[in-house]
Amino acid sequence: MRRGLILLALAPLLMGQGGLPRPRCDFGAGVEALRDAARLAALPPPGLLEGRARGEEMSTRLRAAIPVFIGCGCATLAGHTAEAAGLAANMTGATAAAQISSMQEQARMRISMAQGHMDRQGCR
């Protein structure tokens, strides 16, 4: 009982440490959106119309994660996610299938960088 009270009293201090999300934020939803976008980016490059649709879907998922990460106090992670969302959104304006392939690879790399940042530094 006493140990539980001590942990409860220290929880706000522990959550304030760098690398941890703020309490009561939906960090898991942001992580899941990032994973979903990574799965889409890892698929083989589609044709032009399918590529535009995939870019829109990736961008939508990534943009949904940005306010979650900001609300959790993860500004750097939100920034990396925003860059990935911008690259995915570029796919919607592609004029050739070859552009889709290149743009998807750029978005995939940026998503991978965001995930790597999250794995190495947590919520920052």
Which functions belong to the PLM regions below?
Residues M1-G4:
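Positively charged n-region of N-terminal signal peptides that target proteins for export
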Residues I6-L14:
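Bacterial N-terminal signal peptides
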Residues G19-R124:
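Mature extracytoplasmic or organellar-lumen-exposed domains after removal of signal/transit peptides
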